[in-house]
């Protein structure tokens, strides 16, 4: 399982311009040509091969965060280093790398000095504060890079940089031990990976979905139990199984978390990955009696990203994807927001299409 630079790999000379999909105003995605820039100190230039379309891209596309327009979205980008900026060490031209939501830590703030790179005070979010991967070329901080194992195609690796990393990191840091019951609520873009990771980490896995049509998929992904929230109370169903030590919430909505909270066993934790504006209505009695907890988990740092990719390669965890040409990003984004993706849409560039030679996608 190698992730080292390909020996003898040469990249074609980069042209003076490249194709990108940028947002110039809320909800306006357009294909443009941009001039190629040189990487600055501590940065690398990447020839993008694939970039996942993530629900969090709506923060940029819909202007939910303060944005300096125009901006290129995309934070599940995989490609090859084309140029190194001054001072970059440990990376090589031709090496295949990934860039996730966290654009790179500063290394000197209070949180970095205490080892908490996720909450770096000077962290830039890829595709929000800096241009992301909906493009043939991007510039990224070297401190935010992840190594891509040869086991994955670029398109197959892309969703693991956000959806995979987020679920893997939350489960790895969860207060559950192998053999204990872990529930994954939602079998979508995050949940279908969460079920796989939970199974391969040795947990007893309950998948919670809506409707009977997801039952077969849940079992195929590795769930020991399937709970249909449309047919029964999921909290009661979890208690019938002995109570969950952890409930991983991959679907947005405070009501969703609250509806399952009583399914936790004493000392259990509900970990929220789904961002939404709804308040979480849980009584203090539900928290205190049984000492149950609610926590949020944003994502993981680049080292955890490396671990996510290695673990996925070793265990066979993979994202269910469909690929779309970069130029069709607007249509792909619309389908994703309408809930029509099954389960991750990945944009591929011309470089990505020409390099589809990996063993597994």
Positions of the model-derived regions?
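Short Gly/Pro-enriched turn/cap motifs at secondary-structure boundaries
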Residues: 24, 35-36, 68-74, 100, ...
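Mid-domain Rossmann-like dinucleotide-binding core that forms the NAD(H)/NADP(H) cofactor-binding site
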Residues: 97, 150-236
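NAD(P)H dinucleotide-binding glycine-rich loop of Rossmann-like/cofactor-binding domains
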Residues: 105-185
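Glycine-rich cofactor phosphate-binding loops and adjacent beta1-alpha1 units
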Residues: 174, 206, 212-293, 353-356, ...
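Rossmann-fold dehydrogenase core element
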Residues: 269-271, 281-322
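Glycine-rich beta-strand-centered segment in the early N-terminal region that forms part
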Residues: 37-51, 62-110, 149-152
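C-terminal hydrophobic helical "lid"/dimerization subdomain
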Residues: 3-16, 258, 302-361
């Amino acid at each position: 399982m190698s992730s080292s630079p390909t020996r003898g790999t040469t990249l074609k000379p980069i042209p003076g311009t490249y194709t990108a999909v940028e947002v110039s105003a809320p909800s306006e995605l357009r294909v443009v040509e941009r001039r190629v820039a040189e990487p600055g100190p501590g940065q690398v230039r990447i020839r993008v091969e694939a970039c996942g379309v993530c629900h969090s891209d709506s923060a940029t596309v819909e202007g939910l965060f303060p944005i300096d327009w125009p901006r290129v979205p995309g934070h599940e980008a995989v490609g090859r280093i084309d140029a190194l900026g001054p001072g970059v060490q440990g990376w090589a031209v031709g090496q295949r790398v990934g860039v996730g939501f966290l654009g790179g830590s500063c290394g000197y703030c209070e949180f970095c000095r205490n080892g908490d790179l996720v909450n770096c005070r000077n962290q830039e979010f890829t595709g929000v504060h800096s241009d992301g991967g909906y493009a043939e070329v991007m510039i990224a901080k070297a401190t935010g890079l992840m190594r891509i194992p040869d086991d994955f195609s670029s398109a197959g690796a892309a969703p693991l940089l956000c959806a995979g990393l987020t679920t893997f990191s939350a489960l790895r840091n969860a207060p559950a031990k192998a053999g204990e019951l872990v529930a994954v609520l939602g079998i979508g873009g995050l949940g279908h990976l969460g079920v796989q990771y939970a199974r391969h980490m040795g947990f007893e896995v309950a998948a919670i979905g809506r409707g009977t049509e997801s039952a077969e998929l849940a079992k195929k992904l590795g769930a020991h139990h399937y709970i249909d929230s449309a047919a029964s109370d999921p909290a009661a169903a979890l208690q019938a199984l002995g109570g969950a030590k952890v409930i991983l919430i991959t679907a947005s909505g405070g009501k969703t978390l609250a509806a399952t909270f009583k399914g936790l066993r004493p000392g259990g934790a509900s970990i929220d990955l789904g961002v939404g504006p709804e308040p979480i209505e849980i009584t203090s009695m539900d928290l205190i009696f049984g000492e149950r907890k609610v926590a949020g988990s944003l994502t993981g740092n680049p080292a955890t990203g490396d671990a996510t990719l290695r673990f996925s390669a070793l265990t066979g965890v993979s994202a269910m994807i469909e690929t779309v040409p970069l130029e069709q990003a607007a249509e792909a984004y619309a389908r994703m927001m309408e809930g029509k993706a099954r389960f991750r849409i990945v944009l591929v560039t011309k470089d990505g299409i020409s390099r589809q030679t990996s063993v597994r996608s």
